[in-house]
Every structure is written in structure tokens, then in C-alpha cells.
Design a protein with these regions (language model features):
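Primarily EF-hand calcium-binding motifs
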Residues: 111-113
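Small-residue-enriched hydrophobic alpha-helices in membranes
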Residues: 2-109, 123-211
């Protein structure tokens, strides 16, 4: 599976969906089902995430946009530090993680954030089972992630001491948790702590995202 492509398609689908008004006789689920196969599975995942994040997720139409917001937040954070070092975007992004690994952990975190205050409803589960018949590997992976989302501890282990990726991961989760229910607040607090993000950096990430 190409997680970079999947994440990019999910972000783009959510962004496009937010700018459209469905036909009165056609629900989002109906539209997705007509696509079929793997594309429908990506559409279903977009629907699950978009339902939680709403307009917030339209701010990041790509992994590059997510990285740009995280970099701007880190720059603002660094300016307020006693010993600050100006980093270029390339220096900030220097990481041992491949783009595929970054996309994987960001996508898994977004799913965990979306499910932090509830579970997938039965209709959505049934649609995933039905539409995944043509792409069993992706269907199996998605079903597993939705049934047992990644924990904040596991996320932190995958991220390691990569500040750029940690910032992007937190930012992606925050954009999904638009409503900030009690359980979402707890999830985000635990995520920030597990990622070892400074409170002031978290504040800058939220400000740059428009919260």
C-alpha cells in the first residue's frame, strides 16, 4: 500500500467535499459507493475523518501543507525561546523517517483522533466490508485501524525524537478533533505529552491552524 498516496487522496477528498453541496437525492455515502473498489474505501475513510474534522481539515489539502503549517508554528515558537536557532524548512524537515513512514503515522493518528470520543457506526462498518472486496489488503488494514486505533504511546514510539513529525502528527490530530469534546481534549493532551511537545509549541500549532 502507498500510504503517502492514500493520505494525499484523503486530504484532497475532504477538502473538495467541504466545498460541494450534495444533491438532495444523493447522500455522501451513496456517492462513495458508486465509485467502488479501493477508491470507495479511501472515500469512506475521508467521510469518517471529514465528519469529525469538518471545515478544519480543509486547511490541509496535502502533506506539504501540513508540514508548512507545522514549520510556521515552530518558527514562532523558536522566536520566543531564550536560545533560538533559525531553521530553514529543509533543516526543520530533516528526519530519519521516509515520506511513506510519515504518512502512515499521520494517517493512523487521524483515525485514532476521529475515534477518540466514540466508535464507527454499523452502517460505516458494513460499507467498508462491502466496498473492500476489490482491495482486501487495504480493507483489512483499515478495518484493523478502525477496530483498534493506534495508542498515543505507539504513536510516540513511531515518531521518536523527530520534532517536525511530532508537530505534524499533533496538528493533524487537532484538525480532526474540531469540536473538542471532553474525550478529545484528553486524547490531545495525552498525545502532546507522549510526543514530548512543549506547551508553548502546542499553542503555536493551534494558533497557526486557526484555533
Amino acid at each position: 500500500m502507498n500510504f503517502n498516496q492514500i493520505l494525499g487522496t484523503v486530504l484532497d477528498t475532504v477538502k473538495q467535499s467541504a466545498g460541494k453541496v450534495n444533491k438532495p437525492s444523493e447522500s455522501t455515502a451513496d456517492t462513495i459507493t458508486k465509485v467502488g473498489g479501493g477508491a470507495a474505501l479511501v472515500g469512506l475513510l475521508s467521510m469518517v475523518l471529514g465528519k469529525k474534522g469538518g471545515s478544519s481539515l480543509t486547511k490541509i489539502g496535502s502533506l506539504a501543507a501540513l508540514g508548512s503549517i507545522a514549520y510556521q508554528a515552530y518558527q514562532s515558537y523558536q522566536k520566543n525561546q531564550a536560545q533560538s536557532t533559525d531553521l530553514s524548512p529543509n533543516q526543520f524537515e530533516q528526519t530519519k523517517h521516509s515520506e511513506e513512514e510519515r504518512s502512515n503515522v499521520i494517517l493512523r493518528t487521524m483515525i485514532a483522533a476521529a475515534l477518540s470520543d466514540g466508535v464507527l457506526d454499523e452502517n460505516e462498518k458494513a460499507m467498508i466490508e462491502q466496498e473492500g472486496q476489490n482491495q482486501p489488503e487495504f480493507q483489512q488494514w483499515l478495518s484493523a485501524e478502525l477496530s483498534q486505533p493506534i495508542s498515543v504511546t505507539q504513536i510516540a514510539q513511531l515518531v521518536g525524537n523527530d520534532v517536525a513529525l511530532a508537530s505534524q502528527v499533533y496538528l493533524a490530530a487537532r484538525l480532526v478533533c474540531q469540536e473538542l469534546s471532553r474525550k478529545e481534549i484528553v486524547f490531545l493532551a495525552q498525545l502532546a505529552e507522549a510526543l514530548n511537545l512543549d506547551d508553548k509549541l502546542v499553542e503555536q500549532l493551534e494558533q497557526q491552524a486557526g484555533f
